Amino acid sequence: MNEAVKTLDGWFCLHDFRSIDWAAWRELNPGNQELMLNELSHFLSDMEITKNIGEGEHTIYSILGQKADLVFFTLRDSLEALNEVENRFNKLAIADYLLPTYSYISVVELSNYLASHMAGGDDPYQNKGVRARLYPALPPKKHICFYPMSKKRDGADNWYMLPMEERQQLIRDHGLIGRSYAGKVQQIIGGSIGFDDYEWGVTLFSDDALEFKRIVTEMRFDEASARYAEFGSFFIGNLLLSEQLSKLFTI
């Protein structure tokens, strides 16, 4: 049997995509709308406290197209904590007007090979650079791109039948492309084998949305992607600050 890849795991992630029920929202009087938005604001203030004490992260983006209107991206140190946030959000009055359209569960991961290389032989979990990758601060970039992906298991193009050394070399070459976009695109890789329908959830952040097109296009021509990758739906959106929510929901 081929050797399975070993990973270091950090925060658990929930991408929660919602569509606004504008027809139902319009039926509410402005007073009720304001009460719901205030309740949402208090919820987000509590989320900010958790972020400030280093026990999690979150961000909100407005999604383009008809797949969703919003994505709430939340990171926590356990599935229980993540589920608690999800349940509390669903109990908000405004949640009745935010219809679920898609979700994705994963855990921020780093390959043991890369983590050991970064740590130089020391305990990777005590290395500042490794910890920054496993427990990332979400950048306030203008745009987000999220997509799930898996590795193929199709005849000769079966990623999991390749020897470990060949997989490592392919990933190393693939990673060089990503590193060439340092400063332009920040990525968070969430492992989701056994958690969701695909094997990874990829989240990209950038101030220039065209960088998403450039990096994904370039990676498509790399062998690790061209031969062995399968992709789900892509979601792209714009940063939505908490103070901008009232404007979004104003009819």
UniProtKB/Swiss-Prot annotation:
Task of the protein: Involved in coproporphyrin-dependent heme b biosynthesis. Catalyzes the decarboxylation of Fe-coproporphyrin III (coproheme) to heme b (protoheme IX), the last step of the pathway. The reaction occurs in a stepwise manner with a three-propionate intermediate.
Amino acids binding Fe-coproporphyrin III: R133, Y147, P148, M149, S150, K151, H174, Q187, S225
Organism: Listeria monocytogenes serovar 1/2a (strain ATCC BAA-679 / EGD-e)
Protein name: Coproheme decarboxylase
The family this protein is said to belong to: Belongs to the ChdC family. Type 1 subfamily.
SUPFAM superfamilies given in the database record: Dimeric alpha+beta barrel
Keyword Metal-binding: yes
The gene coding this protein: chdC
The entry's keywords: Heme, Heme biosynthesis, Iron, Metal-binding, Oxidoreductase
